[in-house]
Amino acid sequence: MREAAERRQQLELEHEQALAVLNAKQQEIELLQKAQVEAKKEHEGAVQLLEAKVRELEEKCRTQSEQFNLLSRELEKFRQQAGKIDLLSSNPLTSSDISGSPSKSLSQLMNGIATSLGKGHESPSGSRCVISEFIRPLQISGDKPEQLSVKPTFLSKSRSDTPRCRFDSDMDNDQNSNTSKQRYSGKVHLCIARYSYNPFDGPNENPEAELPLTAGKYLYVYGDMDEDGFYEGELLDGQRGLVPSNFVDFVQDNETRLSSTLSSEQDQNFINHSGSTLEGDILEISPPSHIDSSVISNGAGTLDVNIDEIGEDIVPYPRKITLIKQLAKSVIVGWEPPVVPPGWGTINSYNVLVDKEVRMNIALGSRTKALIEKLNISTCTYRISIQSITNKGNSDELQCTLLVGKDVVVAPSNLKVDNITQISAELSWLPTNSNYSHVIFLNEEEFDIVKAASYKYHFFNLKPNMAYKVKVMAKPHQMPWQLPLEQREKKEAFVEFSTLPAGPPAPPQDVTVRAGSTQATIQVSWKPPALTATGTSHGANVTGYGVYAKGQRVAEVIFPTAENTLVELMRLRNLEAKEVTVRTLSAQGESVDSSVAAIPSDLLVPPSPHPRTAPKSKPLASAGAPETKEEHLGPHLKIDESWEQTHSASPVHGHTLEPPVPNFPSSLQGRRSPSPNRILPQPQGTPVPNTVAKAMAREAAQRVAESNRMERRSVFSERSNAAQYANSDDEEDGYDSPNVKRRGASVDDFLKGSELGKQPHYCHGEDYHTESSRGSDLSDIMEEDEEELYSEMQLEDGGRRRVSLTSHNALKECNKNKTTDATFLEQPDFSQQIHHSKKLFSIPEVAEEDGEYSELLYKQGLGMPYKKKSTIARDSRPPRPYNQDQQHNFWYPAKHRISGMEDFTADDKGCKYSRSLSRSPDSGLDCGSEEEESRFTFRYTCDSVSANVASSCCADTADCSCRKSMRPLLARRKTLTRQTSIEEDFGDLGSSFVEPRSEQVKSSYEKKYETQKCNRTDNLSNEDIQGGWKNDLKMADSRAAGPLAKSSHRDAEDSLLLGNPSSAGRPERVEHAGRRSSHGSAVPQRSRPMLVPSIDGYGGHDHLSPDIYEESETDPGTEDISTRIFVALFDYDPLTMSPNPDAAEEELPFKEGQIIKVYGDKDADGFYRGETCTRIGLIPCNMVSEIQADDEEMMDQLLKQGFLPLNTPVEKIERNRRSGRQHSVSTRRMVALYDYDPRESSPNVDVEAELTFCTGDIITVFGEIDEDGFYYGELNGQKGLVPSNFLEEVPDDVEVYLSDAPSRYLHDTPMRTKAKRKKSVHFTP
């Protein structure tokens, strides 16, 4: 019992002790619970404090964004001002590192303020601290962030022991980094790098102290250059170091403007601009130099927090997925919650996906772990992903994913390249683990590092049409021990791709239209497309910009960074265009049209005409030396020379505001098509085999030869009955007889050509001759080398047919004289002329003094272009004797007139012009000469020249000393003749139109007569002259089917002196035709003068052609002021071509082929008052030619049409048609295998440069095929481009005559026959 009692006491004691211990433990638990509550409160307080600090920093960020926007705009303005120099290779706004303007909002540029503190996410203890978890910058706008060149290099990479300490220290470092940085002293200069420079490739021992440079990039330099030639410099991304002075150019020395720019750039250094899009796109991928440079490292690579982690439209994704446990049939994975910016929203839950299939949904607040079962780990591979579920959508599953199962390797899979362009590509892959970062290698060179949770990469600044090999190597954040060794070692994936060939550039942006500097122009402005440092867009080398209206180029500027140009309103009104577009021009073609810019309606309204002010007198220019021309014309000479060399460009492309430097080849070989990148058309129908093509060529050649022989026999038969005169040149030049009519290009033809849009076949020698396309009506003296240059330019013209039909070519056609003793003149066929505008020829410069007089006489009578028979039949009238009373004793021997000329011209007061006429774009010289005036005014005053003076002059010069008196007339002048005095001179005669005609032609005969007998007096009888005329007439060119006098009022003068337009029946001045006669035809110099027969025996009205007689009913002295229509022979811009100061206000611009309405006669300055596009102003007479309209209806139709069609037939006879020189290019005969009408089949814009032909036509081609697949050929007297795949060469063993008879000269002018297909010249050797 005692033992039991003791035992009980002992148990009670132990029980009490246990109760005491329990109480103590309970008290301890209570204390711990209280401590936990207090700790939780303390933690919540700390969190609240941090949130307040975040809001404060966020507000500061917004403030900085506003300041940054202001500074960015100021920087952009500064760069635009600095852009006055050529920034093609130095514009930072369009360089490879910047795809957008720095004036973008801060939400796009400064969204990376929350940056990670290290390259990886993991710390040794497994904890991590990312500033972006506490600081969320503003949202970004747009689909993709901007590509920037700024890389922060100052963020702290050090790690602290605790997350809070790391956060505090890094925040302090971030806030103080830009203020603690040392500032250089001295003056700040903005520079641009001229060349790329890698210090490690340089010769210096300390390359790390130098800055790497990229050509075209901006940088700052401080102070002065040191003794070694280096500056202290800073790049825009904050890097500082030494800069070699010979590698940079100074842009601006304005320190005040640079101060704000520098501060804005330093503010950018606080921000991380690299990042990726929603898919993790890394945009900061372009290294400082081009891609194929040496191994490039961007330091720490891309930072942890990127643009993809922020933004209202980007859903925060879970982070750091981890494989906790892998079993045979299941796995356990864990992750960390996403970082949600304040105010963005809340995360509702998480989806756990297996191969994109949702296996479970875990609510927010639960453990971030999941057990995934029913997996066959040993045989299959599974992709497990974690996805955030929010009210704004789900996060990207590939940003938190990993692979488990069989054959899992470290390397990424499904590596592919998409969106390949000329200079960029997009690389994507499927990561094995979203925690892995990836290293990008390009062509076996390390290129960049892509951070974790990103699986896309954008390449920029690639080279067009180049193959690239890309390697992506996974870089695990920790060793994947769960994988076997061989699977851990597989870290790389490869893919190859090729960039696209350089293609059309991007179009300009923001096209606007506003009023130009003058009332006649508008200014079109645009924003150039983004250009790389080498001046390319989409891999195409940008050369300039073209302005288009209704598909036609109306203006062009050749400058890659041009932002505006002027467009003539006249062209827009003619096209009835109300809007314009702009295209980027490049060597690889044009871009697509830009956005349409409407032309303000008030700009399209034509201005009211300005009253004509009295012209101011201008001093006359000397004529002797070439430098005098420079002094007289100043800059206009060079401008007009450029126009001269480029005026034949196709009007489809408009005019070039900055004409390129001409480069005319010496031959046709290597000739390019008029338009770049000409497209070769494809034949329609069944292809013709080679054997059939050769058979066609042989058959066609034989058929044409037989047809020619039959037609020649028929023509000769008709000719024997109808011809009045015979000459051996008939076979060359064709036959003009009543039975063989040549169809002229009348006004009806002009209109039909425009309406039908089809180019008819014409032969040489049948075209309507109007004003010369190469000279002025006022004498502009051109030397032979200039003539040769223009002849080459005509060949370069691509066969284009001008509406202004060349009188030069008409002269060349007529100048088929042979270098024999029997010198004779090819007499024009004035029996078949109507609708011919009156023109003046300019006087040539005589190179050899010994032959001056003979050459002048020769050129006076040479090359009279004949006019064609009108399509309106008129009754012929019998000839009647010449009326002697109409002579008025006006005619004297030529020598008397010449010898008395000096006295007369010395007293002439009307020879000084007050307004300078614009030069013809082709001539390059002034458009008038005093020698013209001397001859013209003398012909009127020779009535009062006494016979004694004349005879004494001749008596003293038995050796024809009239050559000496002629030399002052041949001196080169640049002053303009007084046109009104000439008109007054002829108008005062009061006689019919026959008198000037007789004087002109007869004088040449008298000059010839004087050459044989210098002491002849003025007692020369009409009978003597008639006898001489009848004798010499036999030597005249038989091309003239009628007497020389058959012409409209003074048409013999005007067609001999083709150049100055005037109305029918209005007296006009007379001038020599010599310059045109030698222009391009290279007629040999003659020791004897050419003989111009008199027309005494044929001078009466009855002997005139009825066409001429009816045209000349109006008395020239009593003609009323009438309205006439003219056609522009050249493009004319008074702003650049006129030497007159009031040109823009008073003179009208016009384009070649434009119809102009003219009121009255030209004034004393040689200007007409005309109207174009409802605007009235002055028009230089040497730039236009009159069109003789049959009636008012025809005139109205022409005025309504506005322009003559470009397919108007024009003589385009090459310059060596009559010379002994031959083309240096080869000529071949080709037969057409298919029908071809460029207006229907050609894919090219300038269809007027191409020839129309039918199957079986024989086409003569010159030279070799050009690079676009076109020949330059001739058919039926027209030259142009012909597609090579439509032709087959005619066999050499077949003799083909393409003209009516074998000619003694190459390139003879054929006649037009009645055959359906006209014959062109033959080239049988």
From Swiss-Prot:
Alphabetical keyword list: Cell membrane, Membrane, Repeat, SH3 domain, Synapse
Domain Fibronectin type-III, first and last residues per copy: 315-408, 411-493, 507-608
Positions of the UniProt region annotated as Disordered: 153-181, 601-778, 988-1010, 1040-1090
GO CC terms, sorted: plasma membrane; synapse
Residue span(s) of domain SH3: 186-253, 1121-1189, 1225-1292
Listed GO biological process terms: neuromuscular synaptic transmission
Stretches with biased composition (Polar residues): 664-676, 717-727
Cell location: Cell membrane; Synapse
Cell membrane recorded as keyword: yes
Function: Plays a role in the synaptic transmission as bifunctional linker that interacts simultaneously with RIMS1, RIMS2, CACNA1D and CACNA1B.
Subunit structure comment from the entry: Interacts with RIMS1, RIMS2, CACNA1D and CACNA1B, and potentially with other Ca(2+) channel alpha-1 isoforms.
Protein name (record): RIMS-binding protein 2
Native source organism of the sequence: Gallus gallus (Chicken)
Encoding gene per record: RIMBP2
